[in-house]
Amino acid sequence: MTAPILSFDNVAFRYGDMPVLDGISIDIPRGAITCLMGPSGCGKSTLIAMAAGLLTPESGVLRRADGCRTAPMFQDPLLLPWRDALSNVAFGLKAEPIPAAERVERARTVLEETGLSGAELAKFPHQLSGGMRQRVALARALAVAPDLLLLDEPFRALDPPLARRMHARVRRVIEERHATALIVTHDAREAVRIADRVVLLSAAPGRIRAFRELPDRPETRTAAEIAELAEELDALADGELPVRPHPRVGQK
């Protein structure tokens, strides 16, 4: 069995006196897209920050595979306001041992993969719509060719038709790059359109409420299947279906 790229083992975390996560055990397998769902404040973003190395568990153990390159994207795009879209992405590659011209070309390519091109690349963040800023931030994360992509509500600022196109596009890019992704979403349909597996967290302090391995590949799921799976996830999240949580999520 291939070792997971990321593991949370009985992880807990609190902000001050407020417990946010409790007893979280998740294995993130290589090559899969895993979505985290749950109510606001249940610790989804905290798990992303831990995976990115920005927070340390209060208790329990977090393990990353040796040499694992991570790239986070948070709800706030955090773009540099004095740089245009192209140079925002290219700047994220400055630590790479490649010539400046190659950095710019790689940035251009990955921006095009997220649906931005031409005059849009010369626009500054304040000139871009919220959805465009999200796509620049996504391109910046993808550009560094991470092993593990950490996305916190990456499609939230997009209108529904564009979000649906981006689900397929981002999944294709992740697969082409042989990457792994951990994605936070509040939208069950979004999870079904992009993920291989969904982990549902309870209200704070977040605990594993349920785990669902989704059948087939997202691109083969019909509209009726998407609606049925999303309804099941929402029912699990709302406590309307009995939950039989796996002793360790992701471990068979």
Predicted regions and their residues:
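Catalytic Walker B motif of ABC-type/P-loop ATPase nucleotide-binding domains
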Residues: 149-153
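Conserved ABC ATPase signature
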Residues: 124-128, 132
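The feature captures the beta-strand-to-loop junction immediately N-terminal to the Walker
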Residues: 37-39
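Conserved ABC ATPase "signature" region
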Residues: 102-119, 172
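Helix-to-loop junction immediately C-terminal to a conserved catalytic motif
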Residues: 52
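Conserved catalytic motifs of ABC-family nucleotide-binding domains
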Residues: 145
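Hydrophobic anchor residue at the start of the ABC signature
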Residues: 138
